[in-house]
Structure formats: structure tokens, C-alpha cells
């Protein structure tokens, strides 16, 4: 039996548009959990809906859906694909900054000079769902 690298399996499922497989579930769970930790209001079902159709509906008629939540979730889908395509590239500053740029493209943060999208942070991060958790200060980020 021939061994298949996980990345090759995921890329194969992606390229063949396999529904319900490892690639499909990884995309949805990765995007939902990462964005939820950052304060996204999209549900797992809405995340799947966005992945499947490119659109999302509110769970309730009075719920609002933030544009940044949609953009960041879509960006996560794109970033996951980008990582699959660059998995063998050396991890360096350029790769990290490119990935950050993909994640924040089209969001309100992209146009905020304090956010330095596509570069290293210049202001401290806040993880809205984890009170009391402190992240590394910008001055302490190794370059």
C-alpha cells in the first residue's frame, strides 16, 4: 500500500471537489474555531453555508451578520488552500506576512495603519473571547 502525505490527500479532495471528506470538514472546523476565538458571531452552520455557497443567512431575522465576520471566514478558506499549496516552502518572514495579508484582506483592519496587515504587529493583540489572556507585545515578537 502506497503512503500518501496528508497534504496530498487534502489537495486531492479539494481539487476533486469531494464533499464531506477530510478537506471539507477541516476547512469548516478550522475557519469556525479560529474565527470564533477571535470574536466572530458566525455559527458552525453559517460557516458551512458560507463555504458551500459563498453566502450566509442570519439564524434569526433580527440577527445581523458583520461584514468582517464574512470576510475573515472566507479569508480562512483561502488561507487554508494557500497553506496547502505552500506546505513545502520554508517558513520565513515573507511567508508569514503573506499569510497574514490573506487572512485580513478586505476587512476593516486592512485599512487601519495600526494593524499593519501583511506585516508584524505594531500594537498589542486582544483576543476578545479569552479575558485575562495576554499576548506577546509587539516589541517582543522575534523578526
Regions found by a protein language model. Name each.
Residues 1-143:
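FIC/Doc superfamily catalytic core
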Amino acid at each position: 500500500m502506497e503512503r500518501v502525505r496528508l497534504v496530498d490527500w487534502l489537495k486531492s479532495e479539494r481539487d476533486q471537489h469531494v464533499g464531506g471528506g477530510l478537506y471539507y470538514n477541516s476547512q469548516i472546523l478550522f475557519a469556525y474555531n479560529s474565527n470564533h476565538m477571535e470574536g466572530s458571531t458566525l455559527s458552525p452552520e453559517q460557516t458551512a453555508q458560507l463555504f458551500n455557497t459563498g453566502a450566509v443567512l442570519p439564524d434569526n431575522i433580527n440577527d445581523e451578520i458583520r461584514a468582517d465576520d464574512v470576510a475573515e471566514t472566507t479569508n480562512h478558506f483561502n488561507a487554508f488552500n494557500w497553506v496547502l499549496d505552500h506546505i513545502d516552502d520554508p517558513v520565513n518572514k515573507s511567508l508569514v506576512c503573506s499569510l497574514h495579508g490573506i487572512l485580513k484582506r478586505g476587512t476593516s483592519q486592512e485599512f487601519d495603519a495600526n494593524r499593519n496587515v501583511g506585516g508584524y504587529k505594531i500594537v498589542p493583540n486582544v483576543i476578545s473571547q479569552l479575558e485575562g489572556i495576554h499576548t506577546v507585545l509587539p516589541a517582543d515578537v522575534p523578526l
